[in-house]
Amino acid sequence: MSNSQKPPSLQPNEIIKRTKPDYNWKVIVELGKGGYGTVNKVIKVNEEGFAIDDKEYAMKTEQKFASKHSSRLKIERNVMASYSKCDAQCKEHFPELIDFGQSPVWKWIVMTIVGPSLEELKMKYKPSDIPPSTILQCGLQTMKAIHDFHQIGFLHRDIKPANYCIGYGSKSETIYVLDFGLARKYRLPEWYCSRASHRCEELGRRDDYESWFFMFIDLVDTTLIDWKGLTRPDAYAKKQELFTKLKTYEKEPMFKVISIYLDTLVYDSDVKFGFLRDAITDYARSCKLTLKEPLVWFKERNDNESGSTPTTSATACSPSSSTGTGTGTGVSKIASNIDQKSIASDRNEENSLDGSKTGTWKSTKTRNKKPSRK
């Protein structure tokens, strides 16, 4: 099959056969579609095609002919297999890798299903509908996800609201980071990419946090992120101006603290997660805000729930990421059983990201010299 040809989508009720005969996957409905494949809601079924239980999952596919170098699904599977070995508290913000395999047309992975992305929620809710507590908790959870991702030895490199999703149904108070196709061992969308990315410098842990910071600012006050749609040079200049402005910004003191700290970091700096977390929690305390209130969509679900269908719809990251253009929340009121055999069979091909084994911290490149931050 040539790259110009696209395989048909998986169809509802289609059965995806596994190597192991204990169960197969049945497609329920398509959740999303991208350039290389689809995301579908699936369930486990027996050989006769009957459901084994009432659990639902997300199957992410990629066209089989995707080249070794362009296969984001392969990288994503490697990353997920790596953190699957970690303790539960270290992966609470990551979707679980359930299964993976391939057919004559598709490569696929199955993971826990999630709810809407933060990008979708920004478009769904009016600014006045999102309480300050929810915004701050989103900031803390999304930042903790980055911290945990760095702890297992990876940079995400694609931090944006579309790559964070709330949990599905009763788990909608937890925020998950997804879409690890650009992850590397120790290119971002234009809106949220760090300034180092504009300068074509090697990206480090600091840059994931800077992208998170732009995303957090956009959740709090959309008027500050004013470079959407600009060219890269103009967007870079705007980001430089914003950091200069925030260092004396009294309207949101936590922005001042965070921006000053981030500008002290260089490529190989060990980012102090506790310092950034305290900047948010101290601000919440000064504003007499509690961070134990239910997130607004979780509260809405409980208020509307009739005992059957959850209000948060299932979704998953598109196989080919796209940047949303929806209106931000503008909440400036804040101031007021993995198949191990399959893994082993592909180990020679897939045991590396940037030439280094998964689960380790060292890169193959010697980093004796810090890149210039001028």
Curated annotation (Swiss-Prot):
Its EC number is 2.7.11.1. PROSITE patterns: PROTEIN_KINASE_ATP (PS00107), PROTEIN_KINASE_DOM (PS50011), PROTEIN_KINASE_ST (PS00108). Residues 306-324 have a biased composition (Low complexity). InterPro entries: CK1_Ser-Thr_kinase, Kinase-like_dom_sf, Prot_kinase_dom, Protein_kinase_ATP_BS, Ser/Thr_kinase_AS, TTBK_Asator-like_STKc. Keywords: ATP-binding, Kinase, Nucleotide-binding, Serine/threonine-protein kinase, Transferase. CDD domains: STKc_TTBK. Belongs to the protein kinase superfamily. Ser/Thr protein kinase family. Residues 25-296 form the Protein kinase domain. It comes from the Eukaryota. SUPFAM superfamilies: Protein kinase-like (PK-like). This is Putative serine/threonine-protein kinase ZK507.3. Residues 364-374 have a biased composition (Basic residues). It catalyses: L-seryl-[protein] + ATP = O-phospho-L-seryl-[protein] + ADP + H(+); L-threonyl-[protein] + ATP = O-phospho-L-threonyl-[protein] + ADP + H(+). ATP binds at residues 31-39, 60. It is an enzyme of class 2 (transferase). The keyword Nucleotide-binding applies. The active site is at residue 158. One of its GO terms (cellular component) is nucleus. One of its GO terms (molecular function) is protein serine kinase activity. GO terms for biological process: signal transduction.
